Amino acid sequence: MKVVLFYDQGRAHSVAAICEVLCAQGCAVTPHAIEQVWNDTSPCSTPLALVQDATHVFFLYAHEPMRDPAFIFFSGVACGRGMHVLLLATTTEVRDIHVFRDLVFLLEEETFEDFFRVEHERFVRQKKKRVARTALLERGYPCFEENFIATVMDGNIDIVNLFLDAGFSAALKDARGTPVLSLAVREGQDEMAAQLIARGAPVDQLSDDRAYSALMEAAQIGNRTVARLLLHAGADPNVRGSNGQTALVLAVGRKDHVLIRLLMDHGANPYLEDKLGLSAQGYAKLFNDPTLCTLVGV
């Protein structure tokens, strides 16, 4: 984030302190005395060169800036180039400025430091997105949701991280309404599931087809590794699918003693009934399996 600071002589005494504040927020600052810049008649000098690489133009005036042609010129150039134009309000006249309200951010002395902190964080996020999108295109991955979903299912962690850096959501669902985390579990992509969880994928997000959570998907296929990972990440073991079944019921159906014990240790409720009126305990009795019955507390 590169800030060009233009100031008049009436505020020259404040420049060093303001530059120190901006540098502390991670900004590269180049100060220019507006009178010197505007009156420079050197044939090698051009005002446009001063803002060539800038991302933000910051004005600091002791008097009304609307009367200054330098302010009008540089703010116009900055707006035309898509830069952010900032003006530190120090007088009543400046605070009452209306003509440039839609083009200029008016900052207060008491809060401008907080503004630059937040702005720098926003700038870094946007830059990270741009870099990631460029990297995706260079590797042959146009920035479409379908490509993101396909790389999740393929287990390409490096590319998925680029998609996430580029602004794609770890909570995205495919066209059928299945969350990308559930897709990773269904495809047996354990490392991908772990990465999505680390990048903020909601662990209890349900699929639209059968209202299964990722934990239920793991229980259905007996993936203890991912089930343990999800439970440690705070997944609810008592989420119920469209048929009323829970991950515990699915584990009982597979007679997976290890997974049943894992779910019970994390608070799975063996009394919850599905739409057939059977709970995990009910299925254990139905299977006439003493070990299952013991595990679910029959």
From Swiss-Prot:
Gene3D superfamilies: Ankyrin repeat-containing domain. SMART domains: ANK. Pfam families: Ank (PF00023), Ank_2 (PF12796). ANK repeats lie at residues 143-172, 176-205, 210-239, 243-272. Keywords: ANK repeat, Repeat. PANTHER family: M-PHASE PHOSPHOPROTEIN 8, ROLLING PEBBLES, ISOFORM B. This is Putative ankyrin repeat-containing protein TP_0502. It comes from Treponema pallidum (strain Nichols). The lineage of its organism: Bacteria, Pseudomonadati, Spirochaetota, Spirochaetia, Spirochaetales.
